[in-house]
UniProtKB/Swiss-Prot annotation:
A divalent metal cation binds at D14, H16, H48. It catalyses: 4-CDP-2-C-methyl-D-erythritol 2-phosphate = 2-C-methyl-D-erythritol 2,4-cyclic diphosphate + CMP. Its cofactor is a divalent metal cation. PROSITE patterns: ISPF. Gene3D superfamilies: 2-C-methyl-D-erythritol 2,4-cyclodiphosphate synthase. It comes from Corynebacterium glutamicum (strain R). Disulfide bonds: none annotated. The keyword Metal-binding applies. Belongs to the IspF family. PANTHER family: 2-C-METHYL-D-ERYTHRITOL 2,4-CYCLODIPHOSPHATE SYNTHASE, CHLOROPLASTIC (PTHR43181:SF1). Binds 1 divalent metal cation per subunit. This is 2-C-methyl-D-erythritol 2,4-cyclodiphosphate synthase. Its EC number is 4.6.1.12. Homotrimer.
Amino acid sequence: MTNPIIPRVGIATDAHQIEAGKPCWIACLLFEGVDGCEGHSDGDVIAHAIVDALLSASGLGDLGSFVGVGRPEYDGVSGTQLLKEVRELLESRGFVIGNVAAQLVGQTPKFGPRREEAQQVISDIIGAPCSLSATTTDHMGFTGRSEGRASVATAVVWKV
């Protein structure tokens, strides 16, 4: 009898404060005319939450242990690069990415018109289906006051 393939699920959140004048990267897409998020990297909350969820699902740590803020080679790193590197890491450890899902929480940018484009971009990077959504918090909390953005993500992987 062979061992069944058992899916592993990871969940993660990411949040960043909005920084006036910084480019706005969300789900590996640049949103023109919208202030971006502060951070050691590009501030892409969706990409970061997905990376964290993939690391969680595979048992390989979290975003902080993966890149860490003390590593200068990751200063300003893009969400695209982080997703590529975590995919390579998972594959090198014998994991396959099943799918990911993430939700943007914030007042801006208007995500709906670019949702399908973002899903395709991330899917192409990770080699697996990606589902994305967005919501506001009806002007409650730091995301509702447009002080920051957040994302929640889940990932399914399995060991081959």
